[in-house]
């Protein structure tokens, strides 16, 4: 999965209804900092990946809340803190430069949000979901 870098070009941070996500994304990042996320690479990745596109459009206004949201099929997208913490923990075992992971296999990827975040740090991400 080659997601890194394409999101900001393809999905400008404004919805079709004109709602802007910039302020709420900034608030999400500040909240993650306040909750103890320290790796700025992780915070940068979360600020670049547009979480709202992984949700039904009816939930876009809640996309950057620090909570799990339903994605259908009795599943949820993980709250941003959990995504940040898992990614930060994974990166704590790697170097600090460039693409630090070669291959990542994510089992139970749901809508792909965590996979998109991981694509900022891995050469290849393979995501598997049972749906």
Regions found by a protein language model. Give the residues of each.
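Conserved SAM/SAH-binding loop
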Residues: 111
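Conserved SAM-binding motif I beta-strand of class I
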Residues: 124-129
């Amino acid at each position: 999965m080659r997601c890194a870098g394409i999101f900001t070009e393809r999905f400008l941070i404004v919805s079709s209804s004109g709602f802007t996500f910039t302020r709420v994304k900034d608030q999400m990042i500040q909240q993650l900092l306040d909750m103890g996320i320290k790796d700025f690479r992780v915070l940068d990745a979360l600020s670049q990946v547009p979480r709202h596109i992984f949700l039904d459009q009816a939930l876009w206004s809640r996309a950057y809340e620090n909570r799990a949201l339903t994605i259908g099929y009795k599943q949820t997208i993980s709250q941003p803190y959990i995504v940040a913490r898992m990614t930060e923990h994974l990166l704590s075992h790697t170097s600090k430069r460039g693409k630090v992971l070669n291959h990542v296999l994510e089992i139970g990827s749901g809508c792909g949000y965590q996979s998109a975040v991981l694509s900022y740090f891995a050469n290849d991400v393979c995501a598997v979901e049972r749906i």
